[in-house]
Design a protein with these regions (language model features):
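Acidic, mature catalytic/reactive cores of soluble proteins
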Residues: 1-599
Length: 599
């Protein structure tokens, strides 16, 4: 049966986008989330976090609906939703945001295209377009023309251009669909051609673009469809204009019910962006690295003494003051709805390693249009200086504790990685003095971390210098080349983390109390880190089983949020989460059969 408009929302959502804007579509074909005019803009569609109010959505409701089916067109982010009624009528909604080459540049307008196709019978449908602005506080006016409707907000005007009757849309009247309908929502610009022809042309061009992009990927033999979907999702999480990468498309989806752990993730965390760039690089999608490199260079050039914040706005904004949107009711009524993220004020030393690690490939990859050179290396060296100075100083850590600071082992290792990679880059550039200097620093840091970050009592590396708590981020020590996979210390650390942080087939990031109490849900990226660590220490069969379980835990469309209830499997946290999609890609690459061995 159809899910009613007043049903509780969930994260069974399809993502569409074009690296300028994005939208989330529920299983009934209703757009319930979408920010304009860019990924971190105000939500024009906010129903996902305001389900107590019948606004902020773009619905195409089939009368007497009995079932729905949703899927992506192969190797694209073009989403199809089929709705069937009890009279034998059916319609298909095809949703996408245009993206393709035009006039020598990438065309990615602030635009959504919805095509409604009659599949069978004489379906009766009602179109409800109820955009919002001002995070639920703003009012707007509506004007109309013969083939369009304008929504006039304080800071932007949106125009719906359509070949459907405008009156029926404005009055939300049910209408018999006797022919296909095209709805184009975008800027307040006249459409000077047939709406249907424009929709078809944009559809064909967009589908071709994504087919060509996917064709360029170096995917593993196993789990190709899942990896391709994850890669497309990561691509949609990048902002072409600057090269920034958002952590997720949403704000304030709670990490766990009624927890207050509601955060705005529509910004660029340097840490998350490194993982995204690294995963796409491994698939051969180097264009993301080149654009992100431009973003990073601009951040470093604009900072004071190359000091880094942990996150920035996708336009490079440095101030992301956190506030609450009181006019929005929250996901399932769970407030607060937060705008901005005060973590930008925090000290997180791993950021220096994240930037250097993200950029390192530029010095070794001959495919790049502009490979790294001495000038870029000199821009990175001040980051290494900070890393060497700060590696043994307290910070908020990668989990962004708001109530305390420690010398976090993961942060220290990432600072070491910054200096280690600078030594490797200097060697590549044939700069012997710089190589020797950075190698000495990295060696000294490694010795300190190996001593201070290790607990003899726990027989494992621990969360912080001199501490006893365990932290799932330490599962990355092998991935970062800090220790070898067969190093007894790493094996012991994996086993200790397994014994303390594993819940069923899922992994917590930590289990001790934090600023909001005791964590209750597993953190999806940590489960993937655990899978990768198991594969590295020779427990491949178990790793493969856990990976298959994670694939079965995705949404029907193959997406993941940040968190998961380890008992029920329900997804929580902002969506879709780049961290989680990165984990899927990396684990697939680690566990797949090689192409040459597969057949």
């Amino acid at each position: 049966m159809t899910r009613g408009a007043d049903a509780m929302p969930d994260l069974e959502l399809g993502l569409i986008g074009n690296c300028q804007i994005s939208a989330l579509v529920d299983t009934q074909g209703t757009i319930v989330w979408g920010c304009f005019p860019r990924l971190d803009g105000e939500p024009v569609f906010s129903h996902l976090i305001d389900d107590g109010n019948d606004r902020g959505r773009f619905a195409i409701e089939l009368q007497d609906q009995t079932s729905s089916r949703q899927y992506y067109l192969r190797n694209t982010p073009i989403l199809c939703t089929e709705l069937h009624d009890r009279h034998g009528g059916a319609l298909r909604i095809t949703d996408f945001a245009p993206r393709f080459a035009q006039y020598g540049r990438r065309f990615r307008p602030v635009m959504l295209v919805r095509h409604v196709e009659v599949m069978s019978g004489t379906p009766v449908a009602r179109i409800r377009l109820r955009p919002t602005a001002g995070y639920g506080a703003d009012t707007h006016t509506v004007t109309q023309g013969s083939n369009h409707v304008r929504f006039v907000f304080d800071d932007q005007v949106l125009r719906l251009t359509t070949d459907a009757p405008v009156t029926s849309i404005l009055q939300e009247q049910a209408q018999v669909l006797e022919r296909d309908v095209t709805l184009i929502l975008g800027p307040d610009e006249s459409v000077t051609e047939s709406v249907a022809e424009m929709g078809r042309r944009f559809f064909d061009e967009t589908r071709t673009y994504w087919h060509e992009w996917v064709r360029s990927l170096a995917v593993p033999f196993d789990w190709q469809s899942a990896v391709i979907r994850a890669a497309i999702t990561l691509k949609l999480s990048t902002f072409d204009d600057t090269g920034a990468v958002v952590a997720a498309m949403t704000t304030s989806i709670p990490e766990v019910a009624d927890s207050g752990r509601n955060w705005d993730y529509r910004y660029c965390w340097l840490r998350d962006a490194y993982f995204v760039v690294h995963a796409l690089n491994r698939l051969g999608a180097t264009g993301t690295l080149e654009r992100y490199l431009r973003y990073i260079i601009n951040l470093v050039a604009g900072s004071d003494d190359a000091l880094l914040q942990p996150l920035y706005g996708i336009g490079g904004e440095t101030t992301l003051t956190e506030s609450e949107a009181d006019h929005l009711g929250g996901y399932r009524g769970m407030k607060p709805v937060r705008i901005g993220n005060d973590a930008y004020r925090q000290i997180q030393h791993d950021s220096y390693g994240a930037v250097v690690l993200a950029v390192t490939q530029a010095f070794f990859d001959e495919r790049l249009t502009r490979p790294g050179d001495v000038a870029l290396f000199r821009r990175l060296e001040p980051l290494g200086e900070h890393a060497a100075r700060l590696f043994d100083q307290p910070d908020a850590g990668l989990w962004e504790y708001r109530g305390h600071e420690k010398v976090h082992t993961y942060s220290a290792v990432m600072c070491w990685a910054a200096c280690d990679r600078l030594a490797r880059i200097a060697d590549r550039l044939e700069l012997p003095d710089a190589h020797d200097a950075w190698r000495r620093r990295a060696g000294d840091m490694h010795a300190v971390i190996s001593e201070q970050g290790w607990s003899e009592r726990r027989g494992a590396f621990v969360e912080s210098f001199g501490g006893e708590r365990l932290d799932a981020s330490l599962l990355l020590l092998h991935e970062l080349d800090f220790v070898a996979a067969d190093d007894p210390r790493f094996v012991a650390t994996v086993e200790a983390i397994e014994g303390e942080l594993r819940r069923g087939d899922h992994m917590f990031r930590y289990i001790g109390d934090d600023d909001f109490g005791t964590p209750e849900n597993a953190f999806n990226i940590c489960t993937f880190w655990y899978i990768d660590a198991l594969a590295a220490i020779g427990r491949g069969a178990e790793a493969r089983r856990l990976f298959e379980n994670m694939l079965a835990s995705t949404t029907r469309l193959g997406l993941l949020s940040e968190d998961m209830d380890p008992t029920t499997g329900e997804l929580w946290g902002n969506f879709p989460q780049t961290y989680s999609m990165v984990g899927l890609i990396n684990s697939a690459l680690a566990l797949s059969r090689r192409w040459e061995d597969a057949f």
